[in-house]
Amino acid sequence: MPQESPDDAGAGGPDRNRKVFLRGLKVLWVAMRGEPAVFGVAVFGASLHAAITVASSWVLGRITDQVILPAFADGRTTAAALTAAAAAMLAVGLFKAIGLALRRLYAGLMQFRMQARYRRAVARKYLRLPLSWHHRHPTGQLLSNANADVEAAWQPLAPLPMVVGSLFMLLIAAVAMLITDPVLALVGFVVFPLLFAINVVFQRKVSPVATRAQALRAQVSEVAHESFDGALVVKTLGREDTETERFTAAAHRLRDAQIRVGRMRGMFDPVMEALPNLGVLAVLLVGMWRLSTGAIDPGELVQMAYLFTLLSLPIRSFGWLLGDLPRSVVGWDRVQAVLAAKGAMPHGDGALGGTGGIRLATEGLSFSYEDGYTADGAGSDLADAPEAAGERARTTVLHDVDLEIAPGRTVAIVGPTGSGKSTLTTLLTRLVDPDAGTVRYDGADVRGLAKGAISGVAALVPQTTFVFEDTIRDNVALGADVSDDDVWAALRLARADSFVAALPAGLDTRLGERGTSLSGGQRQRLALARAVVRRPRLLILDDATSAVDPQVEAEILAGLRDTELAATVVVVAYRRATIELADEVVFLDRGTVTDRGTHDELLARSPGYERLVTAYERAAAERAAAAQTETFAETEEAAR
């Protein structure tokens, strides 16, 4: 999803401004086609307001001639004349209010409907795109696309009906002025084009600056989200000042761009305020001369002057619209870049029947990723590459992997860091598709299964657990139609029932953002309960119990084997106790299956496997010794 840098976004000239204007009109046309009825009511209200506004000047002129001047001349007026004048003014005010209410209400309705529609469209697209796409785009940028860019795209819809009504008003006003006095009409015909010319000049000047400001908004959002999301790393490494400076620099660039826009508006607005007033002055000067010659009467002069006064605000609406168009085009482009993004995986219409564990098989499975992305989320090895084909070198992470796992078996995937274990788990659940080869469930190619078929039978518990800011019940059920008994059963299987039962509100306990009120092991056990509550036929654990006490981990894995769940279990394992519980061990090294068998068989015949398991044990012993030393030191400190 390539998007302009802030500096590129600010570049431009007359040709670019013309293109921005034309493309802005196309964006508005999309909205008009999307909400024709609502737009029609808003334009009707704006046109009613415009027509009554022009009519009000005629009413004021008639009142001047028939009520005010006779009252000054004779010192009195009739009740009938006063009643008629009051009724006319009341009718004018009432119809103007109706038109204004319809215009504002339905313009807002149109704007907010389009924003909601495209926010939903962006969110749906995000959920359909594969992980590889998300790993290539910062979360802050995605948030900006769904919020600030959608708002900017449809910002011009607020003044749009007013602009259409203003065009109608100018047409009626021009006819009224020509009928009243062609000479005074010429004065207006000089002022109005000048106002339009100033609006066009302003739009050309402000367009590149407003475009750059919109791009900088996304940049600020990206930096802020990255800093907040990495708060733990920032604090532990003492990088608060560096991150503050980075955010400050981005915020200052946005501030400077917005100040430039403000300065331009500061020069533009006074001119737009002054010109209509100068037009009124010109009308009065020329009108006094015309009045002295008897060409017009006092009421017609009042009518013309009042009309000029009323037209200043509608004319300014053109400036508001033109000023919003550059940001609208930038927002629209960024939203469309998301909606047009490629990478969504095709699905077939196949279904999976049966019960019990899945027969899982892979045939010639190979996968490569774009350089700069890794499977742990620091980038991604899950590249879907159509967008970036040819732009990056690719590194093979899995090559010709063949597996056959019988239903109900537990298989441990063991291998050194970077051997492709996590990538394999994402391929097994079809979070990405392989470059070559096939993954089969009960003999069926997963690419031929209907959408939702895989998630209906398989569950993946990843390395990094995610806990929603919600209740424990909703975190475990996560939208599934399960009873509280099912939730408690899943919690017991994940050995999470004891700590949940100890909480004051039990299942109704609300967890903080990302489950910060829980320990790492508790979060992992909740994630495991979330997976097993759906009673999957295939359960994949990607180092999903690394933060759990080894004894508890052994109980969990033993429970998975003994339960009636009877799922096929694939576990990425690092602890010897975990590996020993598996029916079979697959040793993965440099993206290739180098050996497979029981734990004892691999220890006996695979030197690489033996070295790796020994290293795991040594690291575990060192961590245990360090924890024991820390506990002893804390006990001694407390005793003192």
Regions found by a protein language model. Name each.
Residues 1-53, 68-85, 95, 103-107, ...:
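Membrane-integrated ABC transporters
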Residues 11-21, 44-45, 52-65, 88, ...:
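Juxtamembrane helix-loop junctions of ABC transporter transmembrane domains
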Residues 4-16, 112, 120-144, 148-150, ...:
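Short intracellular "coupling" helices and adjacent cytoplasmic loop segments at the cytosolic face
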Residues 355-640:
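ABC-type nucleotide-binding domain
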Residues 70, 176-190, 264-333, 338-339:
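Helix-loop-helix
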